[in-house]
Regions:
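Glycine-rich repeat segments that build the extracellular carbohydrate-interaction surface of secreted
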Residues: 3-5, 17-36, 50-60, 87
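Short, solvent-exposed loop/turn segments that connect beta-strands within catalytic domains
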Residues: 21-23, 98-100, 128-129, 198-200
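Extracellular beta-strand-rich solenoid/capping regions of secreted or surface-exposed proteins
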Residues: 35-52, 64-88, 93-114, 129, ...
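Solvent-exposed loop/turn tips at the surfaces of repeat/solenoid architectures
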Residues: 49, 56, 63-65, 70, ...
Length: 287
């Protein structure tokens, strides 16, 4: 295990990591630090590496150590070329103040996997009502796994997590919460994007695989899941699924709230559509 207490030490530990997917390089965070405003666009690039970062835990306060960025035009982590990263018992502060699609706190690119374990917390920022801050961007064929009490929260305008059409979100625990301030439509936390190719539609795979925290509250922002104010796009009916080993109940359906549907430049609020439980899946239908 490698102990790091500065951004420079963490960068070096990542660059020299030689772990595998089954036995990732173990890095222990031994102190809180900020990433300087003059840092590279991606402060920590994880290119084909397999890494697990855990918190050494502040011996005085017992609180998690944290990584934060001083400028919201920088991204903290980027995973590329099949990389994997697990973050446990640490806090990340995005300190974002405005929306920009290329400055998510964490980018998970194609074929990469990010796991957020127990004790992880991400606060992406404090934007204005018309901003769209992104905490984590999950690209096509990329995977985000949330476990235990992992939490992503506290931005004003949702998109705490943005999942591309062939992206995967596995909920083995965890919660993604919007901060309940500003206008009603600004309270979104999970954005799912569909892709349209002729008559074919591709949508993200979202599964609930274990018990979720009692205060889980996923506020959904769906893109291209509907055709109009009264019609769900064929093939885009299923929003969340259970698994063979975990069956959804209506109490789980109530942890997911449909806030907005956007298609063709039009946004439809929850007065037009609703979520309902159908077998082991949460689906969308017109009211």
């Amino acid at each position: 295990k490698t102990l790091v207490t500065t951004a420079a030490e963490l960068k070096t530990a990542i660059e020299t990591a030689d772990g595998t997917a089954d036995a990732p390089t173990q890095i222990i965070l031994g102190g809180s630090f900020e990433v300087a405003a003059d840092a590279e666009h991606f402060a920590f690039s994880i290119d084909g590496k397999h890494i697990a970062i855990d918190d050494g835990n502040n011996p005085i306060s017992g609180d998690n150590y944290s990584i934060s960025r001083t400028a919201s035009d920088k991204s903290l982590f980027e995973l590329t070329n099949g990389a994997s990263l697990k973050l446990t018992n640490l806090n990340i502060y995005g300190n974002a103040a405005a929306h920009s699609a290329d400055v998510a706190c964490i980018f998970v690119r194609a074929s990469c996997k990010l796991t957020l374990g127990n004790g992880f917390e991400l606060y992406s920022g404090d934007g204005f009502v018309d901003d769209q801050l992104i905490g984590i961007s999950v690209g096509d064929n990329a995977t985000l796994i949330m476990e235990g009490d992992a939490e992503i929260s506290k931005s004003i305008k949702g998109q705490e997590v943005l999942v591309a059409p062939t992206g995967i979100l596995q909920l083995k625990g965890g919660k993604i919460k919007a901060r309940e301030e500003g206008t009603y439509e600004s309270e979104r936390s999970l954005c799912l994007q569909a892709a349209i190719n002729g008559n074919q539609v591709t949508i993200p795979t979202v599964t609930v695989e274990n018990e979720l925290p009692a205060d889980s509250d996923f506020k959904l922002d769906l893109y291209d899941y509907v055709l109009s104010s009264s019609t769900v796009r064929p093939g885009a009916e299923t929003v969340v699924k259970g698994t063979d080993s975990y069956t959804l109940t209506d109490s789980y359906r109530m942890k997911f709230h449909l806030m907005t549907n956007t298609t063709g430049g039009m946004t439809y609020y929850d007065s037009y559509f609703e979520l309902y439980l159908d077998g082991n899946a949460i689906k969308i239908r017109a009211k």
